[in-house]
Amino acid sequence: MKIIALRSSLKLAARIAEELKTEPVMPDERRFPDGELYLRYDEDLTGHNIFIIGNTHSDAEVMEMILTLSAIQDYRTKSVNIIAPYYGYARQHQRYKNGEPISSQILTEIYSSYSNSIATVDIHDEKTLSYSKVKFSDLHANDAIVRYYKNVDVDYVVSPDDGGLARVADISAKLGKKHFFIEKKRIDDRTVEMKVPNVDVNGKKLLIVDDIISTGGTIAKSSGLLREKGASKIYVSAVHGLFVNGSENKILQNADEIHVTDTVESKFSDISVYQEVCNYIRDIDA
C-alpha cells in the first residue's frame, strides 16, 4: 500500500502511516507565478493500493484532490482509494432553488470517476453517498470520542438538537451514561427557541456532542442554557471542528473545554480517528 498525504491532513496521514508501518507519500508541490497549483508524484506507485488522505473542504483542497487523482493515472496502481476525513460541500446535497448547483453531486461524480472507492467520517448528509459511481463508505467517530472520554467524569451526554440524538445515544450507552437533547421550537422564519428538557442538571458534569462546529451558534446557546440551569462542568466535543470566525471564543464563554477529532486539524484536535481509518484501509489492502 501507499499512503498519499495531502496538505489538509498531514498529521492524521502521518499517524495512519506509522500505524500501518509505512511512510506517507507527498508530492512535489508549488505554485506557478499566476497562483495556480503544480504538483507531481515521482515515487513509483505501480502495483500498489493507493490511499489518498485529504479533506475536500476549501476550494484549494478540492483542487489538490482532483490534480492528485489526475497525476497518479500515469502509474498502473492496483487501486485508488480516496479518504476525505471531512467531506466538503456535503451540505449542498440538493437543489433548494432553481439555478443552484448540487455541489456534492458534481464533485462526488468527479472523484468517483478517478477512484475505486471513497470514504469519509460522519458525512453531513448521506444523500451524497448515492452520487458516487464506486463504493462510498461513511465511517463513524463515535468510538474515538468514547475512547477519549471513557475516563472523564460526566453525568450526561447531550445533543444540541434532536438530529444528533442517535450519535449521542450510542456514545452515552458506551460510556454508561444518561443522555438527552436540547429541544428546539421554531417561532417564525427567523427565530428558534431552545430549551432544556425536564432534566435536573444542577451541579452536573455534561458532555455536549455534535457532528460539526462551524459558526458555533447552536453549541454556544446550548452551553449557555445548561450553565443557567446550574451545570458545574461543560465539555464540548464534535467530529469536525471548523471554528469559523473564531467561534471557539463564543463557545468557551460558557463551556469549560473543547475537544474535537482530527478530521480537521486544529488546536482542539485531541481525539483521533486514525484507528477507524486504519481498520478501513486494512480491509481493502488485505
From Swiss-Prot:
Family: Belongs to the ribose-phosphate pyrophosphokinase family. Class III (archaeal) subfamily.
Active site per UniProt: 184
HAMAP family in UniProt: RibP_PPkinase_A (MF_00583_A)
Family annotation (NCBIfam families): PRK00934.1, ribP_PPkin
Assembly behavior: Homodimer.
Binding-site residues for ATP, renumbered to this chain: 34-36, 91-93
Protein's name in the database: Ribose-phosphate pyrophosphokinase
Cofactor: how bound: Binds 2 Mg(2+) ions per subunit.
Domain of life: Archaea
Functional note: Involved in the biosynthesis of the central metabolite phospho-alpha-D-ribosyl-1-pyrophosphate (PRPP) via the transfer of pyrophosphoryl group from ATP to 1-hydroxyl of ribose-5-phosphate (Rib-5-P).
Enzyme Commission number(s): 2.7.6.1
Reaction catalyzed: D-ribose 5-phosphate + ATP = 5-phospho-alpha-D-ribose 1-diphosphate + AMP + H(+)
Gene3D superfamilies: 3.40.50.2020
Required cofactor(s): Mg(2+)
One GO cellular component term: cytoplasm
